[in-house]
């Protein structure tokens, strides 16, 4: 049975969940392209997906903003069809053994500051800045950082007059506690400064592998938030950033010094990290850690395969004394065995297919996994966002949740 939305998009398997609603892999039937489809039950009050889709539409045209293909209602669901993206920074962080190099962190920081600045220029704050909500593009856009999930976004100023929202206190925590600003923990209304402070914690998370306030135990969620808040406030910025370039501490101190309605100096923050980038002698080649890991795994797999073939060739010759001294091709023909072709060297720019059947080594499996991850395919993921990945740990290729199948979405049965 084939499920369709908007009479143009084929609904596939579930690939994640956003702030509100579930996300599915889909196909644009006319174009033959894969898309991401976000669904929300029409009974949801207020209709969060409708609000989020309106924000996305306001953001359209910005660099690193996913393209919206279609919005509407289908059966019992509100639907938003979006551009399909690659893995999140959280997925890639795990892929890189939870450690990014300084070069990769600085390349990311530059783009992430720009994404947040763009959202602010459109009169909104994101309020959930975290690694899961930054995704890499696919194909030619593989080096572009996207920002997603506007389910918690809020307008902070009037679009026409630029009148800022008023300062308020006693607000509940909105966002993710791990990356929330101190003022957010204190119940203060969020503004532009809070998005940027959250980004500072994300960058230190990439440096450290984890933040000091992770893994704290508590009986209730409220108590856990309080423990995180206490640890965050009792950890001086200089202690958090100790052992890393001073620019990270400078960044966080700058964010914390901003007043509620201040416009941040985004250019200053970008330049802070760009100057560090140049002093380190890095090149703006947009080669991230996961690119190197992918290529390194490919080279290692190729070397291992070459070594395996050499071993087999030596073993074959040792078992067949009559063929010693003959070229391998001649001996192969003489004995009626299959000719063994020399392995094709793997280079970054050329991949020659080898159609000969052969066992797949562990190293080669790792290479394929790394390449699939780089393209956005599933590798033990659990992201909460719009991605081009499949959560195979929870759902098989053929599974589509029953509540979607019975929703009144257009069904096409091929016999």
Curated annotation (Swiss-Prot):
InterPro entries, per the entry: CK1_Ser-Thr_kinase (IPR050235), Kinase-like_dom_sf (IPR011009), Prot_kinase_dom (IPR000719), Protein_kinase_ATP_BS (IPR017441), Ser/Thr_kinase_AS (IPR008271)
Substrates-to-products reaction catalysed: L-seryl-[protein] + ATP = O-phospho-L-seryl-[protein] + ADP + H(+); L-threonyl-[protein] + ATP = O-phospho-L-threonyl-[protein] + ADP + H(+); L-seryl-[tau protein] + ATP = O-phospho-L-seryl-[tau protein] + ADP + H(+); L-threonyl-[tau protein] + ATP = O-phospho-L-threonyl-[tau protein] + ADP + H(+)
Protein name: Casein kinase I isoform delta
Omega-N-methylarginine, modified sites: 375
Stretches the record annotates as Disordered: 301-415
Region (Centrosomal localization signal (CLS)): 278-364
GO biological process entries: circadian regulation of gene expression; positive regulation of proteasomal ubiquitin-dependent protein catabolic process; protein phosphorylation; regulation of circadian rhythm; Wnt signaling pathway
Biased composition (Polar residues): 347-358, 380-400
